[in-house]
């Protein structure tokens, strides 16, 4: 039987077609009495949003820029109006994140001075998109000449090529930690909103560098202060362990090597009721946000993996009513989250960061053309990322919480329930609190 070759044509309209309505190629193959059913062709419109560069639903942040481009920054959409905001409010956390602040960070020198160009009028947010920009001023593109050909082991060089077929060689482009400027700036704003609303405090600190592990019982999470954390260059609140951590970083820094570590983050006075079952549980959102940071390799909250060694009786947090009539838990192995919803206790989590992949030691690798070779990476890189990761973790936690807070108001506060079940555990509002 001879084969037929039919051209592809768009047939729009009814799916029931008589032979007279068919294209000539089909008419020759059919009898007049035959009705042929065809699936109508529908034009599909695809909407693509800066894939992978945005986070949040109600308080939405989109970051842009590359390590060795003209600059980096973000657009914040959904910020409530009438929030007092100046560039200095954002600059404090950007300074904590910036490179070149001590001998245990990258020697790249950037002031990371931010500029707000929209969304703020006379020191108050207007409710419209806020644009924040930080220029790059200390690029050294020639440091990456070898990396334009060969891939750095355990870096995103290879996977960016595999996915896109092209990559920004200088500084790693979007995979560079410099992208996190666009997270830390809106994170500072999110912390400000949370503080004004409920006195919520978010504090992160370094709890481990390589083999130096700070015992949790040495940190009083109820009374921990930012001053204790910022008292040393490694951002560990315990001076004795801080010195040990600095020594561990110095030991590998002088040899062109690197080490990893852990950042612990706590949230005090978190509003109750944040988080939505079942796929948008609060701990799931926190994990996603924190694990999106560069170099992260692990996340746990509450008792974490250690909880697997306990029985149910040992692990359960028993309830009681405190002197103010509030429902509390005597222990906090749940980490302030139960059933994916915040219960008002201190939220605590730990984020693991791998050793910096770009090191000044000889390593085996391959080129883009699959030729095996050796590489000694040049450039300026952190011997350990965790001291600078502290404000990054705080920022991501703040972005999650402020987005969840706005979602809570959108869903559950149209017809409010007993307010005592949802108010933060803090009895008095901070003096500078304003209604949002």
Curated annotation (Swiss-Prot):
Transit peptide, residue positions per record: 1-50
Reaction equations catalysed: 5-O-(1-carboxyvinyl)-3-phosphoshikimate = chorismate + phosphate
Cellular component GO terms held in the UniProt record: chloroplast; chloroplast stroma; nucleolus; nucleus; plastid
Sample GO molecular function, one term: chorismate synthase activity
Species annotation: Arabidopsis thaliana (Mouse-ear cress)
Top-rank EC class of the record's enzyme: lyase
Name the record gives this protein: Chorismate synthase, chloroplastic
Region (Disordered): 1-24
Organism lineage: Eukaryota, Viridiplantae, Streptophyta, Embryophyta, Tracheophyta
Function: Catalyzes the last common step of the biosynthesis of aromatic amino acids, produced via the shikimic acid pathway.
Pfam families with a match to the protein in the record: Chorismate_synt
Compartment(s) where it occurs, according to its Swiss-Prot or TrEMBL record: Plastid, Chloroplast
Cofactor(s) it depends on: FMNH2
Family matches, as PROSITE patterns: CHORISMATE_SYNTHASE_1, CHORISMATE_SYNTHASE_2, CHORISMATE_SYNTHASE_3
Membrane found in the keyword field: no
Record GO biological process: amino acid biosynthetic process; aromatic amino acid family biosynthetic process; chorismate biosynthetic process
